[in-house]
Amino acid sequence: MTERKVKLDRANKSILLRALGDVYYGQRANGGSTEVTGRLILRVNDLPAGGKLTMSAAEYRLAKAALNQLRTQRLAEGGYTDAVDDALARLLRAHTPLLLW
């Protein structure tokens, strides 16, 4: 399983929580499983500002999709996407930890 580490400052953490919250409430309204999304929200919320978040491949895909969804929503509303773009760029630059054997 590949993991990715991303450093989140206060603004990126807030935007990621907003995006994941929208996905969580959408899943809940549709009667879907919210377990994975809920756990990721709690992990991001417990992270100190400037801390590094380690995500599995599934969590990475979920966070990326959530940020893309929030960006699309803001574009449709005619709002600014600067903060979402920054959080998405930081997430996309997340690296896999180097394992030395």
Ranges and model annotations:
Residues 1-101:
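Positively charged, low-complexity terminal tracts
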